[in-house]
Amino acid sequence: MAMKTDPVSVNGREQITIPVSNDGHFRVKGEINGRPILFIVDTGASSVSVSREFATFANLVGGEPISLNTANGKLSGRLLKNIQVMAGGFTLPSVDIVVGLTGGDPNVALLGQSFLAKFEMTLDDRQMILRNKKQ
């Protein structure tokens, strides 16, 4: 079942505006390694995180074995570095990704701080705005 996302507004590649969904989450379409994915923005997640199923689909191989501390306990996973990630029109060529997200839809990933920290963020109860950081 595909999740509905509200339109994301991209302003001259300077900023994107992500409206809040009815359930209170911020969702944005994107790509990892050129493969389509739906992100749930998770400001508390250290990294972009994907399922093992999606990693196989996106040819995300190798990586360093790691232990993940999640709200549901410890899990094993892999850390991959220097992966291209696009979210809502912003593309970063070198993002750390964790493989090992479990539960839910394998085509939904968490958009964490390994991506978000590269942007200035403004957040209110209706929208999230990501802006290019001033150099």
Question: At which residue positions do the language-model features occur?
Answer:
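Pepsin/retropepsin-fold aspartyl endopeptidases
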Residues: 1-135
